[in-house]
Swiss-Prot record:
Catalytic machinery residues: 39, 94
Keyword Ribonucleoprotein (UniProt): no
PANTHER family assigned to the protein according to its UniProt record, in alphabetical order: NADP-DEPENDENT MALIC ENZYME (PTHR43237:SF4)
Name the record gives this protein: NADP-dependent malic enzyme
Gene coding for it: maeB
Amino acid sequence: MTDAKRQAALDYHAKPIPGKLSVELTKPTATARDLALAYSPGVAEPVREIARDPENAYLYTGKGNLVAVISDGSAILGLGNLGPLASKPVMEGKGVLFKRFAGINSIDVEVDAESPQAFIDTVARIADSWGGINLEDIKAPECFEIERALVEQCNIPVFHDDQHGTAIVTAAGMLNALDIAGKSLESARIVCLGAGAAAIACMKLLVACGARSENLVMLDRKGVIHSGREDLNQYKAMFAIDTDKRTLADAIEGADVFVGLSGPGLMTEEHIRRMADNPVVFACTNPDPEIHPDLARETRPDVIMATGRSDYPNQVNNVLGFPFIFRGALDVRATRINEDMKVAAVHALKDLAREPVPQAVLEAYDKDAMSFGRDYIIPTPIDVRLLERVSSAVAQAAVDSGVARRPYPAHYPLKTVDDVYG
């Protein structure tokens, strides 16, 4: 980042008021009567009602539209383990996106815990304060155990966006890309470079969407994850296959799909040349992908390419998913975000990309036209229809799969965030 851009980022966060979020009042407070209702003695009445039935917290407090964004700061963006407090700007930023795109209030919680179990214990004890929990920037493999334990212990949705948000958007784009390439997920040969939280979640969700595990090769820093390796943790071991392939060059031969969640420049011209016709390449490392889009297209003009960057077509951006997934989950008071809800989000995103693009989106991107094809396989983050389509699909899937505590909302579909409260 240039000095000018660095200073602009610092100024944005510091001026005119430090931080990006604030608390606003939702009730009148102008008179003595207002204050008596807001606090003592009036506040005693909702206290009694919640003590009588904890579900009344959704009626008398902001719990139902409140998500906690929680981190230990062990894997902050691409910066690494910088500690809980340093993660606060990122957690506030996540809150901005929740509010901007789905009308969800949030609070950021940075936990200084000496172990994964200490983190789990801390969060579990206070989880009932919120309608949902978004885990963020927690390193692998600890993030898997933390999420699993909290899902089991909490009766509200717990969602590690670094895993599942990336997976949902990737799967949606992948289904569309393969369709354009004249291929199917069920028969596609997939190579995944990377075996961290996002990579493992992506491959698990692709399998849930129809990919065959025997057609999937995953690589970590030591090469292909195969059944002969004895250094695999339980999460990598799920993807160990019986093969004589050992390197990316071996694995990529004839592959239909490459998913990169690893590091910059790790895919070469020779690698992409070895892929099958109409190769699908998702090079998602930011800011520099596994292979630069210009180089990929120069080497393989038939490539269908996606990256994590906003300055190239087909950006894999988690903001396409998490605000609307939580919106749908909160509005039916789901106890968890399960596989059915994730798959529903995948198909909602996939289908939306096939519809005509609104004029407002074209103007925002200074385009005369955008339509479903090689350069448009995923919707754009500013498409207002995301709120309607993804939230509705997730809410319906929660109801259908039995994790909703309320019926499908009568005020759905949502057209804008102003419709959130019906």
